[in-house]
């Protein structure tokens, strides 16, 4: 979800949900990858077939292969990459209103653009040797682009912050 402001006014608010799959196949020392957001079974079957055919026509690389089974992770450490907080659009708008007012405080400022974006992801890795692990991650990003003008020139600059946890955004 993202909210965008321009010159202290709400410009747009977007939400999108994406679901996709990525498939990598190995044949000997050959490897290829393919991805799709069409998760219908018949498409997945076609996707796998295409990936295998592509792999057959890919040059060998001595470093391409699945890891030995004894090297596979047994546990995945929690790296604290996920914050399940969901910030309401009203809160994003309030944050951006304060940001835009602060950014426009100098009379030389002629244009401002600010945005607040919230992303959530779920990653799963599985292979034919029985490995299947995953993790969730989140991202909260605030950014601002400011244009200043005086008698002789115009200058543009930006600032942003991106954190896994909402509480870490200043």
Protein language model annotation of sequence segments:
Residues 1-170:
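Active-site bordering "gate/hinge" segments
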